[in-house]
């Protein structure tokens, strides 16, 4: 019901049915992610952290490995000389005898089948010099190198000799033992060019022998070079390890260090009847070796290509 106003006039009627409603108040959206959204991203985040950690560790490991490898190659190219160890040191002799000397046979492999043995030309000559001596003693340095026959195999298998076979090259050493030289000993080593033991780098490409005084300039950086460490013992130390002081035949092939090896021998303490030395150097080097052996009471008797035969004067008949 409409009530009259003071002037008897009714006020205008207002209706709200067609007026628009005010918009509802809006809620402020939170800018931070919710816990549920974090749970959805957690596996991916964990993977990224783990991947980054693994890659960091891998890079550090690779850098350390490369550094260690380089240092190893540097050490492999460096000769170790045991200056304080005399060639007649009792501990050295015991070490050679108990650790390095072994029978010249390979029990786990079938012996190599070869024709002969037949004496080489220089061996046949030496047999005549020694009047077909039986049961002699030899030392052969460089036996079976590069597939060559041993100059002492005929002496051992046909004339009952025995002795020591020296071979520094690993492959040739194992082939040596397959020749079934049961009367002799073998050693995987080289003859030292100094009157004390040393450890050197053996370059597999040096097929003529161990280049003791030469280190290849590309040894550290050149991956085509395969190097191994080889121990070198003085000739006199090896004789003491075998309990001998007298040798009928010494065959010396050491790839360029023959003179230095001969200079380490105390000729006043050992007796070597015949020395067959390989000389592949120039004429001046040959003359130097000849003069040295002549000074040690040897006389030059005959040459066979690069092999030169010397004999101790007082042993000649």
Please give the residue ranges for each predicted region:
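Phosphate/nucleotide-binding beta-alpha loop and adjacent structural elements of enzyme active sites
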Residues: 2-317
């Amino acid at each position: 019901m409409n009530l009259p106003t003071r002037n008897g006039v009714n006020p205008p009627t207002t209706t709200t049915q067609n007026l628009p409603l005010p918009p509802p108040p809006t809620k402020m959206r939170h800018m931070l992610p919710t816990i549920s959204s974090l749970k959805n991203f957690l596996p991916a985040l964990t993977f990224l952290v783990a991947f980054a950690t693994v890659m960091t560790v891998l890079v550090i490991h690779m850098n350390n490995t490369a550094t260690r490898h380089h240092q190893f190659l540097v050490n492999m190219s460096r000769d170790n000389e045991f200056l304080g160890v005399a060639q007649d040191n009792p501990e050295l002799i015991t070490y050679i005898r108990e650790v390095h000397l072994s029978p010249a046979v390979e029990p786990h492999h079938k012996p190599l089948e070869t024709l002969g043995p037949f004496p080489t030309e220089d061996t046949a000559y030496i047999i005549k010099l020694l009047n077909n001596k039986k049961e002699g003693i030899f030392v052969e340095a460089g036996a079976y190198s590069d597939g060559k026959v041993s100059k002492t195999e005929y002496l051992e298998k046909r004339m009952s000799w025995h002795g020591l076979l020296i071979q520094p090259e690993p492959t040739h050493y194992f082939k040596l033992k397959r020749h079934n030289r049961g009367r002799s000993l073998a050693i995987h080593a080289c003859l030292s060019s100094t009157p004390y033991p040393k450890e050197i780098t053996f370059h597999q490409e040096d097929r003529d022998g161990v280049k003791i005084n030469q280190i290849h300039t590309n040894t550290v950086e050149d991956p085509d070079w395969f190097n191994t460490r080889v121990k070198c013992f003085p000739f006199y130390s090896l004789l003491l390890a075998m309990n001998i002081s007298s040798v009928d035949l010494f065959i010396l092939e050491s790839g360029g260090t023959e003179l230095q090896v001969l200079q380490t021998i105390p000729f006043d303490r050992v007796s070597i009847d015949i020395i067959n030395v390989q000389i592949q150097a120039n004429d001046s080097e040959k003359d130097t070796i000849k003069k040295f052996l002549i000074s040690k009471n040897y006389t030059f008797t005959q040459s066979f290509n690069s092999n030169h035969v010397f004999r101790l004067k007082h042993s000649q008949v």
